[in-house]
Swiss-Prot record:
Natural source organism: Micrococcus luteus (strain ATCC 4698 / DSM 20030 / JCM 1464 / CCM 169 / CCUG 5858 / IAM 1056 / NBRC 3333 / NCIMB 9278 / NCTC 2665 / VKM Ac-2230)
Role according to the record: This is one of the proteins that binds to the 5S RNA in the ribosome where it forms part of the central protuberance.
GO cellular component annotations of the record: cytosolic large ribosomal subunit
Family: Belongs to the bacterial ribosomal protein bL25 family. CTC subfamily.
Gene3D superfamilies: Ribosomal protein L25, beta domain (2.170.120.20), Ribosomal Protein L25, Chain P (2.40.240.10)
InterPro entries: Rbsml_bL25/Gln-tRNA_synth_N, Ribosomal_bL25/Gln-tRNA_synth, Ribosomal_bL25_b-dom, Ribosomal_bL25_C, Ribosomal_bL25_long, Ribosomal_L25_dom, Ribosomal_uL5_bac-type
Superkingdom classification of source: Bacteria
Subunit structure: Part of the 50S ribosomal subunit; part of the 5S rRNA/L5/L18/L25 subcomplex. Contacts the 5S rRNA. Binds to the 5S rRNA independently of L5 and L18.
Entry-linked Pfam families: Ribosomal_L25p, Ribosomal_TL5_C
Any one Gene Ontology molecular-function term assigned to this protein's record: 5S rRNA binding
Name this protein carries in UniProt: Large ribosomal subunit protein bL25
Keyword set, alphabetical order: Ribonucleoprotein, Ribosomal protein, RNA-binding, rRNA-binding
Region described as Disordered: spans on this chain: 182-207
Length: 207
C-alpha cells in the first residue's frame, strides 16, 4: 500500500531556469502542488528524501510547510534528468483522507505458462481507483497453465480489497503465444551459401 512519508518543504520565491538550477545545486527539487480548487503552490523539497520517496510513483507524501501545516499529496508528474535519472521537478496533487483517486498501478505476473509458450503483457500498468491513503503498489494476474491462444482479461486481475479496476471487461491484459523456434539448420545453409558466393566473387575479381 501507499507509503506515507513526512517531508519538510519551503515556499519557492525565485523562478526561472537559473533559479531552478541553483535550487538543484543546493539539494532541492522545485515542485508545484495542485488540487481542490486552490491556486498552485510552488515549493522546494529536499532532493535526497524526495527522490527516495518517489521511487514508488504512487507514494503518498505529507508535506510540512514552514508554519507546521501538513498537506497530503501524490505525485502527478515526475520529471527526471535524461542522463543522471535524478528528479528535476515534481507536479503534486493534494488529496484528502477518504478521497478516491485513480492511479496507474504495476501489473505483476504469477505462475508458469504451458511448456512451449510465453506470455506478453498488453498492459504493463492499469488504472485503479482507491482511497488516496491506501493505494496498492501493484495488482496481480495469474498465467499458471495458460496455453497458446489464451488471454488474460480485465476481470482476471486480482485487485486488493477497497480498490477497483478502471477497465472494461473485454480488455486484454496479457496474451499467451506459442514460442517460435528459429531453424538454425536453415540459417547455417544460408550462411554457407553466402560464404561460397563471396568466395566466388573474390576469385572472379582476381582473373
Amino acid at each position: 500500500m501507499s507509503d506515507q512519508l513526512k517531508i519538510k518543504v519551503t515556499r519557492r520565491t525565485d523562478f526561472g531556469k537559473g533559479a531552478a538550477r541553483q535550487a538543484r545545486r543546493a539539494g532541492l527539487i522545485p515542485a508545484v502542488v495542485y488540487g481542490h480548487g486552490q491556486e498552485p503552490v510552488h515549493l522546494l523539497l529536499p532532493a535526497q528524501e524526495t527522490t527516495l520517496a518517489v521511487r514508488n510513483p504512487n507514494a503518498l507524501l505529507t508535506v510540512v510547510n514552514e508554519a507546521g501545516e501538513e498537506h497530503l499529496v501524490l505525485p502527478k508528474d515526475i520529471q527526471r534528468h535524461a542522463i543522471k535519472d535524478t528528479v528535476d521537478h515534481l507536479d503534486l496533487i493534494e488529496v484528502r483522507r477518504g478521497e478516491k483517486v485513480v492511479v496507474e498501478v504495476t501489473v505483476q505476473v504469477e505462475g508458469e505458462v504451458a511448456p512451449g509458450t510465453e506470455y506478453v503483457l498488453d498492459y504493463v500498468t492499469v488504472p485503479v481507483e482507491a482511497d488516496a491513503t491506501d493505494l496498492p503498489e501493484a495488482v496481480t494476474i495469474s498465467v499458471e497453465g495458460r496455453e497458446a491462444g489464451d488471454h488474460v482479461y480485465a476481470p482476471d486481475v486480482q485487485v486488493p480489497a477497497g480498490a477497483t479496476l478502471q477497465l472494461e471487461d473485454d480488455i486484454v491484459i496479457a496474451t499467451v503465444n506459442e514460442v517460435v523456434e528459429q531453424d538454425l539448420g536453415d540459417e547455417s545453409v544460408q550462411e554457407e551459401q553466402a560464404a561460397e558466393s563471396a568466395e566466388g566473387e573474390s576469385e572472379g575479381s582476381e582473373d
